[in-house]
Amino acid sequence: MTPPESDVRPENPTVRRIGGRYRLDERIAAGAMGAVWRGTDELLNRTVALKELLVAASPGEEDTLEESRQRILREGRIGARLQHAHVISMFDVVVHDDRPWLVMEYLPSRSLAAVLAEKGPMGAREAAAVGEQVADGLTAAHAAGVVHRDVKPGNVLIAEDGTAKITDFGVSRAVDDVQLTRTGMIAGTPAFLAPEVARGGQPTPASDVFALGATLYAAVEGEPPFGLDDNAYALLHKVATGTVRPPVAAGALTPLLATLLAPEPANRPTASQARAALEAVAAGRTPTGLPAGSAFALGPAAPP
């Protein structure tokens, strides 16, 4: 794509700029729907991340393209509400060549999914330290009336110093937003959905808490609580039953996973309660004050 004249500086005509101030330096990630660039805000002289919508409409797919545009704009609006140490900050939204771009905080990091793929499962206390930060970010989101709806290892970024931040609010929902997901479609990643969402219910803060539990289960066990299946419909059926396989390597995290993954939303802790419990596990203490609901029968907890 050739940049418009207004976004090309005479001294280097090959440099791409978005919105007249954001220089694209390197594409660092790409998927079917979009790409993420490392860039420079030349006005403030800081490194930023820019998210680009890549979808091109084919005949008959104009609705899909418009839905994608609206989703990325919604991500920008929701991100602007959330200024928190464990949520990737949103700085700006720019429409360029009729495509929305999100300008976000750049965090040199890898996703939790990438960390697990390289290093294998975590120990209970290490996973709890990550989960505590994610729960802290979710607490802020829920207080702002935002449900993330797609908490999973791929949407948790881990910096070199161990800082964890939630990213990708593209399918999240604010209480005052219009519904963008078409009737009959489920937003989120099947392996990490709460059972009530897999059955067609509306996502709630409690379903985010379940997804947090599923993420931590995957972090210590090596795969999600309902396993993996290339057949998304078969996997959704498993998730809808709410029957979780008891973990074998979760150690001191086991009792907390049991309540985070409780089949009934009312039996799960809030994100704030989960944060406090995860802080305790990370510090080697026993969490207290959790709901009585459990996803599986509990024996004696294994050591951390």
Regions found by a protein language model. Name each.
Residues 97-111, 115:
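Conserved short submotifs of the Hanks-type protein kinase catalytic core
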